[in-house]
Amino acid sequence: MESIILNLLNLTGEERAAFAVLAPQRFHPDGDGLTVEDWQSAQVILGNPPPECLRGSTALRWLHTRSAGVDPYTAPGVLPSEAALTCSTGAYGHSVSEHLFALLLALMKRLPNYRDQQNRALWRDLGPVKTLLGAQVLVVGTGDLGSSFARLCQTLGARTSGVRRDPA
């Protein structure tokens, strides 16, 4: 019997073709149009289905989420006990840390304030701006994302310290 794979990822045509070479699967970006029977017959799901759609899915053997967090899927009764749950931890650290870094620099240089002034046709000096050179940056979370963010800050001369939830 062929495994039923539901691929909920939002893919390009080229990406779909690459997935299809690996194994036959049904593509339903974000789960649109799937019935209760579709959910309950799936053995593999790639993506982030609504947890309530998985209750009673006794055929499910593997759920891989496109997100790092899986809390909604760990509640009792959401997944069958035999199902493996994997996630995309580590896939987003660099790109998200670049976004955080850009926001940090924008705030340090007061770019939102200057943009607001520009919208009002004002050009007032808002005083000195900060630099990362020699700054002390506290990073909350030392996983993939936090570590990547700390490296970016260090590149511009900041000293970094990190804190995390558990001491491990």
Question: For each predicted feature, which ranges?
Answer:
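Generic structural signal for small/hydrophobic residues in well-ordered secondary structure
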Residues: 45, 63, 100, 137-141, ...
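An N-terminal-biased, well-structured beta-alpha scaffold segment characteristic
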Residues: 1-86
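Phosphate-binding beta-alpha-beta segment of Rossmann-like dinucleotide-binding domains, i.e.
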Residues: 81-136, 162
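Rossmann-fold NAD(P)-dependent oxidoreductase module
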Residues: 18, 99, 103, 148, ...
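Short, flexible active-site-adjacent loop segments at beta-strand->alpha-helix junctions, enriched
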Residues: 50-51, 66-69, 89-92, 106, ...
